[in-house]
Amino acid sequence: MRLSALLALASKATLSPHYRYGMSRPGSIADKRKNPPWSRRRPVVVEPISDEDWHLFCGDMVEILEGKDAGKQGKVVQVVRQRNWVVLEGLNTHYRYIGRTKDHRGTMIPSEAPLLHHQVKLVDPVDRKPTEIQWRFTEAGERVRVSTRSGRIIPKPEFPRADGIVPETWTDGPKDTSVEDALERTYVPRLKTLEEDVMEAMGIQETRRFKKIYWY
């Protein structure tokens, strides 16, 4: 884990009470365009699912159960937990225009639309068919996903972050700051100024006398 991961926690965008989550990252330009500070959008009702019960992650192979691409399998490339959405690579697409101006109609590109969590199912690695899963614990105490049909463990995939790093396989390099060094307390606040601290550390005695200052 690098120092940038810790700094990212402090740079999270502050969201308003009327904020509505979407496909764009909170705080990005596209997100600010859809959620201006003065907007009062109607709240969206979302089925409450705890983090312990959520079982879909980026990199999972799933099969679509509903819609025009029902029966097709694809890889999860984005998860929006606040809306119970998953986005599959190249599936459930619609077309939209980008770069539209007054004189140019823009360029039409395909865009993946999100699917609700109950519209997809994980693919069993044994027979490549959709299956229900249960959370269980191994003998080592690790919490894993288990297929209810075959009993096979479905491991959580190693999926890179937005910066291309896979946290499970990352090893610190010579120029990376470790978590222990980043969290180590090395600064002790004092009432002295920087100049006074330097003089005390170097054994410098102040022999000059300040001139008197008069206020009128």
Curated annotation (Swiss-Prot):
Gene3D superfamilies: 2.30.30.30. GO terms for biological process: translation. Its main location: mitochondrion. The modification Phosphoserine is found at residue 24. It holds the Pfam family ribosomal_L24. The keyword Ribonucleoprotein applies. One of its GO terms (cellular component) is mitochondrial large ribosomal subunit. Signal peptide: none annotated. Residues 56-89 form the KOW domain. Keywords: Mitochondrion, Phosphoprotein, Ribonucleoprotein, Ribosomal protein, Transit peptide. It is found in: Mitochondrion. Residues 1-9 form a transit peptide. SMART domains: KOW. GO terms for molecular function: RNA binding; structural constituent of ribosome. InterPro entries: KOW (IPR005824), Rib_uL2_dom2 (IPR014722), Ribosomal_uL24 (IPR003256), Ribosomal_uL24_CS (IPR005825), Ribosomal_uL24_KOW (IPR041988), Translation_prot_SH3-like_sf (IPR008991). Belongs to the universal ribosomal protein uL24 family. Component of the mitochondrial ribosome large subunit (39S) which comprises a 16S rRNA and about 50 distinct proteins. This is Large ribosomal subunit protein uL24m. It comes from Rattus norvegicus. The lineage of its organism: Eukaryota, Metazoa, Chordata, Craniata, Vertebrata. The gene is Mrpl24.
